[in-house]
Amino acid sequence: LVIESGLGTVTVTEVLALSNSSADRIDTRNQPLKQKLPEGLENFRMMESSSGAVIQHYLENNLLKIEQDFPTGNSQIIYQYLLPAWFGSLEINREFNFSLDKVEVLTPEGYLQIKSEQLIFSGKQSFHDITYLTWRSKASDSNLLTFTISNIPVTSLQYSGVSGVILLSLFATVALFFQFRLNNKKRTEEPTI
């Protein structure tokens, strides 16, 4: 998983590495590979394979189904999606169909902060002149990885919503104050008999 920051979102790029050591091709068109993706994802897109072929896939209710014929050797499936963040942080719950000890999380150095009891910081790696911080998953019986991302740049709309609620509360308080004051003034001006 490669996690990059956006404005009020994170971009998640997942790379599935498949190794077919048999002499036969692996055909998943009748029994697709399935990946359960996080809730709330937006703008999903599948990248082309290294051969330039389009990978057949379907996304229904956060379940990605991949129908492809994989040749002998190594293949990669790369796809990307956005996850919206709220006030600069986000919790990701990602379920995998394989052991978590094969999962790595990378993020460009100096931007996002990642925290999880299930991840161990494993150092830095450089790709294409970008240095990434890298975490490896601890061995676990669970196939659910949970981690929190913070330091995500926040959109001004998130703050304007909070400002709007505060202003509305202030207006309601002032209106109630004047209503109460007007009612008290009417009571004191009424003649007593």
Task: Please place each PLM-identified region on the residue numbering.
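Lumenal/extracellular ectodomains and adaptor appendage modules
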Residues: 1-191
